Amino acid sequence: ARFAEAILKTCFHYGPIACKEPDNYEARANLMWASSWAINGLISGGSANNWSVHPMEHELSAYYDVTHGVGLAILTPHWMRYVLNDETLDNFVDYGVNVWGLDPSLDKYEIANKAIDLTQDFFCKDLNMPASLTDIGIDDENFEVMAKHAANVKGGSIQGFVNLKPEDIVKIYQAAL
C-alpha cells in the first residue's frame, strides 16, 4: 500500500508541473517512472486488483471518443463516493492521511470525503480535465449496455472494495453526468 501511495504522491506533485511546463524533463521523467511502476503489476503483489474503475472506463472509450485518462479522471471521484461506506472507510482514511496529508484526528468520514474532493480538484483544476461526462458530450443513452459489458468482463460483477453489479455501474455513470 505504501508503494502505491508514493506513486500517487509523485503524480500529484509532478502532474501539474508537467501540464504547466511541458518541456520540464524532471516532471516528465518522474511521471514516466511512476507510470511504469503503476502498470507493471509489482504494487499489486500478486493479489487481486480493487481498481473497479478501469472496466467501467473501458466501456466509455469503446462507445465514445474519450481517452482512458480523461474517462478515469471523470469516473474515479464518483466511484469513490459510491463505494464509500463503513467497510471501505479505513481505505479512504489511509488515502487521505497518507497521500493528501490530511489530519488523522478529524472525523473519518470528513477525511474520506475531503480526500475524494481533493482527488476531483486535482483532476479538474490542477490538470484541467473535464469534470463530468456531460462536459465531453456523453449522455445516458448507452449506460445500461455499457454497464452490462463492464460487469461481464469479470463474470457478472466487477470485483473490488465493493462488488459492482450493472445497476451499480449505471448509478456511477449517472452520478458522473
Task: Tell me what each language-model feature is.
Residues A1-L118:
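Active-site segments that bind and position negatively charged phosphate/pyrophosphate groups
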Residues V99-L177:
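C-terminal charged capping/lid subdomain of soluble metabolic enzymes
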